[in-house]
């Protein structure tokens, strides 16, 4: 519950209050300070008694508000007056207002949890899983992740966004507190800062894994600089930071965090991976010692080290860290099936040029025969990935390629595939139906030296088509049918 008086105080203290508009009357203080709200929402279909409703988004329509009023809405917050006959709290920035009011409404749950946030172009989910398995050795961590979210350590569900909307985020935090959880691990996207989902939130530990061009397009970031800047905001809003010293533009980040408590990891730091093998590595520095690991690839070892250093700051012992790392597996990350002829099928979430390059390098290290890649690109987002995929594929000339659908949304998957193919300097196959593409690729293998690489969707059991999630069995399940 939150009173209107408290709402107004929060907004005024944040210089985010213009006035209340009630009909033709403008008010600085509301005439009835006893008004209270028992529910907050930004979804016009989610209206209960005493709801404070937030109008957000460029596509919001007046009729949504009118429907909410039919359901009993009596008050709303917005950046403009929709003139719908109920009182309005007019603000300058709706997203900032949502964050600050949600924090108070849910009794500041972030102060009752130790918070750990990961950002980076790739590896956020894997690093979050490492942290989850490390912290659960001695604590009760909750996790909000692209792949899975758990608020009680028992039940898991799929997240719609990498970083939830602020009203959902603070509600989740409050549920975690109510469930007796001690820590919260989450992924923070550049979009979360761009659109203000985590405004006013300071994390106990923030980790910056890496940076490469991604999420650049008309509805995301206009330039790489803008993308990089919004990624770096996590460092500004974290009490302790962990940074990969091998990442691009590290010199700038090193200067930025010089006056903050921090750790660096990687070749150019005290915390270096040595004696790296397929399923183990040694570490120098604060956590010097031997570590076994199930997830193959140097990038997974780097993610493990990042999570280890972060969890050390949050109370984990080195023994907890060693146990947690070896226990970690991630759905849709380097999952492997074996065909009857011995060929391997790799299913991985690699969905940009950088992660695809690392995936191909790991597979090529172990499989020396025919390699067939199945790949697509999402519609209406990250258009720059399409050219990036072409550049990566050109660097692997022996690779056979089948282009297919991967969340085409409102675009034609055939045209998306043709755009990717335009950047590839050799003939490729296009099979838009993803199931048929997987079946075809698996029919081309002959021996244990061969491999099929299914990239992009990981464990996602859906296809996004025309703005909606459409049922799809998932790459692993489809591949199992053709073993």
Curated annotation (Swiss-Prot):
One of its GO terms (molecular function) is UDP-N-acetylmuramoyl-L-alanyl-D-glutamate-L-lysine ligase activity. Catalyzes the addition of L-lysine to the nucleotide precursor UDP-N-acetylmuramoyl-L-alanyl-D-glutamate (UMAG) in the biosynthesis of bacterial cell-wall peptidoglycan. Pathway: Cell wall biogenesis; peptidoglycan biosynthesis. The gene is murE. Its main location: cytoplasm. A motif (L-lysine recognition motif) lies at residues 406-409. The modification N6-carboxylysine is found at residue 231. The lineage of its organism: Bacteria, Bacillati, Bacillota, Bacilli, Lactobacillales. The keyword rRNA processing does not apply. GO terms for biological process: cell division; cell wall organization; peptidoglycan biosynthetic process; regulation of cell shape. Disulfide bonds: none annotated. This is UDP-N-acetylmuramoyl-L-alanyl-D-glutamate--L-lysine ligase. It catalyses: UDP-N-acetyl-alpha-D-muramoyl-L-alanyl-D-glutamate + L-lysine + ATP = UDP-N-acetyl-alpha-D-muramoyl-L-alanyl-gamma-D-glutamyl-L-lysine + ADP + phosphate + H(+). Belongs to the MurCDEF family. MurE subfamily.
């Amino acid at each position: 519950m939150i009173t209107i008086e408290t709402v107004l105080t929060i907004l005024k203290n944040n210089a985010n209050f213009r006035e209340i508009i009630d009909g033709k009357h403008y008010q600085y203080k509301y005439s009835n300070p006893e008004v209270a709200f028992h529910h907050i929402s930004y979804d016009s279909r989610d209206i209960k008694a005493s709801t404070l409703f937030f109008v957000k988004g460029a596509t919001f329509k007046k009729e949504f508000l009118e429907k909410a009023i039919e359901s009993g809405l009596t008050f709303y917050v917005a950046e403009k007056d929709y003139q719908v006959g109920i009182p309005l709290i007019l603000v300058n920035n709706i997203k900032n207002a949502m964050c600050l009011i949600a924090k108070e409404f849910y009794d500041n749950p972030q102060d009752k949890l130790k918070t750990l946030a990961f950002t980076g172009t790739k590896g956020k989910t894997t690093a979050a899983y490492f942290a989850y398995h490390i912290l659960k050795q001695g604590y009760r961590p909750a996790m909000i992740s692209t792949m899975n979210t758990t608020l009680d350590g028992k039940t898991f569900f799929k997240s719609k966004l990498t970083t939830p909307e602020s009203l959902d985020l603070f509600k989740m935090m409050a549920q975690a507190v109510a469930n007796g959880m001690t820590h919260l691990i989450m992924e923070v996207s550049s979009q979360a800062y761009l659109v203000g989902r985590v405004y006013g939130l300071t994390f106990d530990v923030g980790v910056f894994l890496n940076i490469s061009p991604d999420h650049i397009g008309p509805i995301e970031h206009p330039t790489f600089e803008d993308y990089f800047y919004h990624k770096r905001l996590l460092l500004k809003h974290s009490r302790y930071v962990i940074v990969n010293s091998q990442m691009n533009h590290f010199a700038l980040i090193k200067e930025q965090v010089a006056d903050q408590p921090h750790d660096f990891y990687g070749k150019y730091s005290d915390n270096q991976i040595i004696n790296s093998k397929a399923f183990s590595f040694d570490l120098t520095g604060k956590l010097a010692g031997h570590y076994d690991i199930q997830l193959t690839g140097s990038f997974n070892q780097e993610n493990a080290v990042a999570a280890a250093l972060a969890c050390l700051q949050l109370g984990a012992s080195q023994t907890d860290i060693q146990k947690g790392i070896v226990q970690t597996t991630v759905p849709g990350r380097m999952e492997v099936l074996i065909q009857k002829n011995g060929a391997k099928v790799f299913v991985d979430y690699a969905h940009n040029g950088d992660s695809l390059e690392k995936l191909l390098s790991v597979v090529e290290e172990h499989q020396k025969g025919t390699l067939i890649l199945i790949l697509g690109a999402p519609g209406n987002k990250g258009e720059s990935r399409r050219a990036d995929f072409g550049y990566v594929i050109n660097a692997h000339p022996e690779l056979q390629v089948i282009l297919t659908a991967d969340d085409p949304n409102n675009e034609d998957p055939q045209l998306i595939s043709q755009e990717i193919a335009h950047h590839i300097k050799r003939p490729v196959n296009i099979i838009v139906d993803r199931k048929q593409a997987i079946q075809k690729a698996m029919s081309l293998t002959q021996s244990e030296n061969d491999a099929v690489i299914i990239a992009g969707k990981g464990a996602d059991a859906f296809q996004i088509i025309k703005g909606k999630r459409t049922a799809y069995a998932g790459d692993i399940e489809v591949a199992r049918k053709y073993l």
